[in-house]
């Protein structure tokens, strides 16, 4: 059985990807080859579920809402530009253990009731079973050391849906430029809480956004990793409804401590 699962994961042929719960590029463009070498494709068994970010050869950061359950077998692909094609640059690694943030409310994963919710602390660390090889196509990115600046131009990337109203996944990794906005711009359009551990980013005129399947992927502002995709509007890219990203400067200590305690 495990051989079959591995074969399916390695071949990437006919993967029936489905958007994860509340997963969140619309209006973007094909990323330049190997321009996002820290971008990771996260799978549960042979199903693509989320994006991720390589922090060092042993650790990947993604969103907590990408969590399945305690017995889920995660694996990742690094160094990929095309999700459904074999590439010489690609590396496959199994995940030995997952670490969702302890303060993320896991009951949200099974709660579809339309009422105000707090989706704070939406991040999860994945410990790789063996280190990634650092190459031109696979490189880690550092955590932020200072607050992001409002108005910054940010780059989000992912293999999420490229259409706002239906699940249409691309083969090529997509990039989109969006603006870092005051959190107040995200409080009005949403029922859910927007807290100080979140970032608000997008285009107030709409049309550019992360979307279903982009969750856990990086938000890089002024060349610095400042967030990972968390949640946003339905449909994606709505005017006056920017998306929400986990604010990583608020979690740098937890990330570093977790990695240090689990070498």
Curated annotation (Swiss-Prot):
Disulfide bond found in the keyword field: yes
Active site as annotated: 65 (charge relay system), 122 (charge relay system), 215 (charge relay system)
Glycan attachment residues as annotated in the record: 69, 105, 185
Signal sequence region: 1-17
Positions of the pro-segment in this chain: 18-24
PROSITE patterns membership: TRYPSIN_DOM (PS50240), TRYPSIN_HIS (PS00134), TRYPSIN_SER (PS00135)
Annotated protein name in UniProt: Kallikrein 1-related peptidase b24
Keyword Glycoprotein (UniProt): yes
SS bonds (residue pairs): 31-175, 50-66, 154-221, 186-200, 211-236
Free-text function comment from the UniProt entry: Glandular kallikreins cleave Met-Lys and Arg-Ser bonds in kininogen to release Lys-bradykinin.
Keyword annotations: Disulfide bond, Glycoprotein, Hydrolase, Protease, Serine protease, Signal, Zymogen
Catalysed transformations (reactions): Preferential cleavage of Arg-|-Xaa bonds in small molecule substrates. Highly selective action to release kallidin (lysyl-bradykinin) from kininogen involves hydrolysis of Met-|-Xaa or Leu-|-Xaa
Source organism (scientific name): Mus musculus
């Amino acid at each position: 059985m495990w051989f079959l699962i591995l074969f399916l994961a390695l071949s990437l042929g006919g993967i029936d990807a489905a958007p994860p719960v509340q997963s969140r590029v619309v209006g973007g463009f094909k990323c330049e080859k190997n321009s996002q070498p820290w971008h990771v494709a996260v799978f549960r068994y042979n199903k693509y579920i989320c994006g991720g970010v390589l922090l060092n050869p042993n650790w990947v950061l993604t969103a907590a809402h990408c969590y399945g359950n305690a017995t889920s077998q995660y694996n990742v692909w690094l160094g990929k530009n095309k999700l459904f094609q074999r590439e010489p640059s690609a590396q496959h690694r199994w995940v030995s253990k997952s670490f969702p943030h302890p303060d993320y409310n896991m009951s949200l994963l099974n709660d579809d009731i339309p009422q105000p919710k707090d989706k704070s602390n939406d991040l999860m660390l994945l410990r790789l079973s063996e280190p990634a090889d650092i190459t031109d196509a696979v490189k880690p990115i550092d955590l932020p050391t200072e607050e992001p600046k409002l108005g910054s131009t940010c780059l989000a990337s992912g293999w999420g849906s490229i259409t706002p109203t239906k699940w249409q996944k691309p083969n090529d990794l997509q990039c989109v430029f969006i603006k870092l906005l005051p959190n107040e711009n995200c409080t009005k359009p949403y029922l859910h809480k927007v807290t100080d551990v979140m970032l608000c980013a997008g285009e107030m005129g709409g049309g550019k956004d992360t979307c279903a399947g982009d969750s856990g992927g990086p938000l890089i502002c002024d060349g610095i990793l400042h967030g990972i995709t968390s949640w946003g509007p339905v449909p994606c890219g709505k005017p006056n409804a920017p998306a929400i990203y986990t604010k990583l400067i608020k979690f740098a200590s937890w990330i570093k401590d977790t990695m240090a305690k689990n070498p």
